[in-house]
Regions:
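Conserved catalytic segment of ABC-fold P-loop ATPases
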Residues: 62-69
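Conserved signature/switch motifs of ABC ATPase nucleotide-binding domains
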Residues: 13
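Conserved H-loop
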Residues: 47-53
């Protein structure tokens, strides 16, 4: 409920660009999917720009029109950009079951996997 209130409070301000940094990370899977669908509905009403930061590749694909993959830190930079050409409106649970979603996931994960391992090694060295 707190996430819904926070999202509503942000949208009331009617920002030109909405920056969301891991907004649903603390939620269980079912609540997360409800919130993701709610975000898509709200977005479709006025189509403002949303910069959505997430470590969840499935979430990125399900919500986005474009995914930008960043390198492992500390000098993070873009290493790939992918157009997400899935039909709208979308249901985040249903879209994940489509062959094109799976294809996009496979393509992006193939590019990301080395960076994920670099990040893992960096975190273990600390």
């Amino acid at each position: 409920m707190k996430k819904r209130v926070a999202l509503a409070q942000t949208l009331i301000m009617d920002p030109e660009i909405l920056l969301m940094d891991e907004p649903f990370s603390a939620l269980d899977v079912q609540t997360r999917q409800l919130m993701e669908n709610e975000l898509l509905e709200l977005w479709s009403a006025d189509r403002k720009s949303v910069v959505f930061i997430t470590h969840d590749l499935e979430e990125a694909i399900a919500l986005s029109d474009r995914v930008v993959v960043l390198s492992a830190g500390p000098a993070t930079h873009p290493i790939g950009e992918y157009t997400i050409d899935l039909p709208r409106p979308r249901d985040v649970a249903e879209i994940r079951l489509t062959p094109h979603f799976v294809e996009l996931h496979r393509e992006i994960w193939h590019r990301m996997k080395d960076e994920v391992m670099k990040g893992y090694v960096q975190s273990q060295a600390r």
